């Protein structure tokens, strides 16, 4: 049998300020020359007299005995204050009537001891409109007589179990009851009418369409595939440059209609220096791609040439990169030119059409 977990109750505090000193709280406070009758209720209950409200407490100002309920969101504190005593609970207490109170939060400084400190309290004022031990006008145990229904001689829990175990039979019983004397709108109002929906055959629906076969792939696996494909292409580019083989890298990285722009990038700069695409640079490209995948998701990565145009910078970041190609980059024109292999403390991410480049430029290492 599953263990029934008891709902956890948090400690709540209420400070009663009885200005008329007619209630039990006011009498106790006057006897010890205090100001507030304070109650902390949680795992234990602590009562006492304090000169100030305590931190994060409800301050209840009253002048008469009465029945007060402080309602603060999901927190409920019910107090029964008389001339001879006080009762407090955080649980349901529905057999009595209440004066419902909504607290107002206040930022205050509490002056106590040798100084003061800042805290928050919540203030409410009760008028005593509901005398102590006033019976609730509605008896929750009494069954009302309502037109159109007949009270069953079973409990609600037993009824729910029966409805759950005989779902189909109960559904048919309801449909039979609704089938006579009610129009479709009224049936739908009661939740019925489902059996009257006409089924459409395949012949009536028209010619069938061959469904496309869709492959379901998670965002995580798709991102891994893109990162792996980029890493492979960057490595291919590095090996090509080491062998000084002319290829059309633009069409490899960005499969678009920018063939003319791709040809121009390859013609600019002539012969490219060997080995300037280092393994360290390749690793850094993958790091940037992974870290800023959201910003770069719609762009394809390109490896810089000896010189060319890479467009305007999307963002510039600080870094500590060593053994990477260094470029002179003109932000106004977007032109760049390879200088040497070394270290840099800044890099630019530049975009042109549907692709981007990572240029270590600016800030010598």
UniProtKB/Swiss-Prot annotation:
<feature type="region of interest" description="Disordered">
    <location>
        <begin position="250"/>
        <end position="273"/>
    </location>
</feature>
<dbReference type="InterPro" id="IPR007602">
    <property type="entry name" value="BTV_NS2"/>
</dbReference>
<comment type="similarity">
    <text>Belongs to the orbivirus non-structural protein NS2 family.</text>
</comment>
<protein>
    <recommendedName>
        <fullName>Non-structural protein NS2</fullName>
    </recommendedName>
</protein>
<dbReference type="GO" id="GO:0003723">
    <property type="term" value="F:RNA binding"/>
</dbReference>
<dbReference type="InterPro" id="IPR037194">
    <property type="entry name" value="NS2_N"/>
</dbReference>
<dbReference type="Pfam" id="PF04514">
    <property type="entry name" value="BTV_NS2"/>
</dbReference>
<feature type="compositionally biased region" description="Acidic residues">
    <location>
        <begin position="257"/>
        <end position="266"/>
    </location>
</feature>
<keyword id="KW-0694">RNA-binding</keyword>
<comment type="function">
    <text>Single-stranded RNA-binding protein.</text>
</comment>
<feature type="region of interest" description="Disordered">
    <location>
        <begin position="203"/>
        <end position="228"/>
    </location>
</feature>
